Swiss-Prot record:
One of its GO terms (biological process) is SOS response. One of its GO terms (molecular function) is serine-type endopeptidase activity. The gene is lexA. This is LexA repressor. Belongs to the peptidase S24 family. Its EC number is 3.4.21.88.
């Protein structure tokens, strides 16, 4: 791995710190603003140089598509967008690792999931939040779970009655998801045990 110039080290440190504080990499515009570049294109050139030196990977097609290669993979894996038909913790879904003590929660957190949408806002789970999840299939009615219906992953409150399962939102603008286990496949990926927002546990 080649040595970094002082400027490249600045860019790398900014990316690492941004991921540790917010759970996601910065955009090119954010890098440019933080380091005083004239434009996001200047940030892009530094990112390409870092990629050539093997310290980051640029993921095409995403404004935050930066993955650190030098980081040790300690901490909780952060799961972003999940592709259909693939395991939740598949390598390609892991955006990075978040340095937090999994023992802060009981039961302990095994991974973080980036929340998409506002269906659970009335209990304080907002779009973009990171949900701390304990990986288990042993859940009870009334608990907030991460569920996979066929190929879609969702966060909802569980209500099970025989072969019928309702996944209940915490927002009156959303309808419950009703699953007939005789016709659809439902997999419980885990139990919600906490929320992180803007780098702070709630």
């Amino acid at each position: 791995m080649k040595a970094l110039t002082a400027r490249q080290q600045q860019v790398y440190d900014l990316i690492r710190d941004h991921i540790n504080q917010t759970g996601m990499p910065p955009t090119r515009a954010e890098i440019a603003a933080q380091l005083g570049f004239r434009s996001p294109n200047a940030a892009e050139e530094h990112l390409k140089a870092l990629a050539r030196k093997g310290v980051i990977e640029i993921v095409s097609g995403a404004s935050r598509g930066i993955r650190l290669m030098m980081e040790d993979e300690s901490g909780l894996p952060l799961i972003g967008r999940v592709a259909a038909g693939e395991p939740l913790l598949a390598e390609q879904h892991i955006e990075g690792h978040y340095q937090v003590d999994p023992g802060l929660f009981k039961p302990g957190a095994d991974f973080l999931l980036r929340v998409s949408g506002m269906s659970m806002k009335n209990i304080g789970i907002m779009d973009g939040d990171l949900l701390a999840v304990h990986k288990t299939e042993d859940v009870r009615n009334g608990q907030v779970v991460v569920a996979r219906i066929d190929d879609e992953v969702t966060v909802k409150r569980l209500k099970k009655n025989g072969n019928m399962v309702e996944l209940l939102p915490e927002n009156p603008d959303f309808q419950p998801i009703v699953v007939d286990l005789r016709q659809q496949t439902l997999t419980i990926e885990g139990l919600a045990v906490g929320v992180i927002r803007n780098g702070n546990w709630l």
